[in-house]
A protein has these predicted regions:
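Short, charged beta-turn/beta-strand-edge "cap" motif at the junction between a beta-strand
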Residues: 161-166, 171
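Intrinsically disordered, low-complexity acidic Ser/Thr-rich regulatory segments
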Residues: 1-105, 169-181
């Protein structure tokens, strides 16, 4: 998983300034909302979630504001980008496997959990669950397997029980700018 931390990125923004920061961070980003002790362990096999756990994960509410959800220092930040040499250039894979474009080596994430895609003009983003064991939720609603669901700036996405906020490149830069003040 990424070693990028929100506060470190805020410091980088202060060093670079707005225009240079936006050039340096041209990709969508995920900010982890719920890192818990014991849940950051690297896992080889997928751990299953009970039906009650799935329901509880999908019932958790959206943050009141985008900045409320990102106030905790040290939050993990993941770049949503294609890794060099990765297959399937039309999508960005996310999963527990080390060779996933966005690697989440967490016990309740499938090896290939899902993927991000985008519209031809790059103005819209989508997430698709690849038939994972513990599901993907967008805004608290379970995503049907193999169905692309639109995501916009600030949308909460859960991969199994792990919650993230999705940011477009401009949305992420705006978030970091507001934190840098």
């Amino acid at each position: 998983m990424s070693d990028l931390r929100l506060e470190e990125i805020v410091q980088k923004y202060r060093q670079l300034g707005d225009a240079a920061f936006r050039n340096a961070y041209p990709h969508p980003m995920l900010v982890r909302r719920d890192a818990r002790d014991g849940e950051s362990e690297v896992a080889f096999h997928t751990a299953f979630m009970s039906r009650d756990m799935l329901r509880q994960t999908s019932e958790l509410g959206q943050p009141d504001t985008l900045t409320d959800a990102t106030r905790e220092p040290g939050q993990q930040v993941l770049k949503v980008a294609k890794r060099a040499g990765g297959p399937f250039q039309d999508r960005i894979g996310i999963g527990r496997a080390r060779n996933a474009d966005v690697s989440l080596p967490l016990p309740r994430v499938s090896k290939y959990h899902g993927y991000f895609s985008w519209s031809l003009d790059g103005s819209e983003y989508f997430v698709t669950d690849a038939g994972s064991k513990n599901g993907t939720s967008v805004g608290g609603s379970l995503v049907p397997a193999k169905q692309a669901v639109p995501v916009s700036n600030g949308t909460e996405i859960s991969f199994g029980p792990y919650r993230f906020l999705f940011y477009t490149p401009d949305g992420f830069a705006d978030l970091i700018a507001s934190r840098a003040r």
